[in-house]
Amino acid sequence: MMAPNWLDKPLPLHATSGGKAFLAWLGRDERDAILPAELPRYTDHTVTDREELERELAEARRTGFAMCDREYEEFSSGSSAAVLNSRRSPIAVVNVWGPAAMNSARRLREMGREAVQTAGEIRDLLAP
């Protein structure tokens, strides 16, 4: 199995679980300033509708994690949780991803819960 090399490569916030986890904790004005007016499509699964993206971000805030299933690359999917500071602003993201063929919706939710737990542990380690 080949793994993508995303080091030093800017990734689209709207088409990755890590980007969505980060965006979820920003205010609407901040998101509007960061995201392009038109969200580019990378695969047939990429969310390009702003209102649909806003619904996904609201769900990410509710559950604590964001999911991405083949939205940036056809062969990968993952779940991510933001590490929040004391003001509940995102300072980092815990990302768990793998081959889309091995990640069912149930597994993505499990990965998301694991990412939330790890993000909380990191937050606690960073707290003064």
PLM features per residue range, with description:
Residues 1-37:
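Amphipathic alpha-helical effector-binding/dimerization core
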Residues 20-24, 58, 120:
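Generic alpha-helical structural context detector
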Residues 25, 63, 121-125:
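Amphipathic alpha-helical regulatory segments at dimerization interfaces
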Residues 33-41, 116-128:
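Cysteine/selenocysteine-centered motifs that mediate thiol-based redox chemistry or coordinate metal-sulfur cofactors
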Residues 44:
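Acyl-group handling in specialized metabolite and lipid biosynthesis
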Residues 48-118:
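Extended hydrophobic
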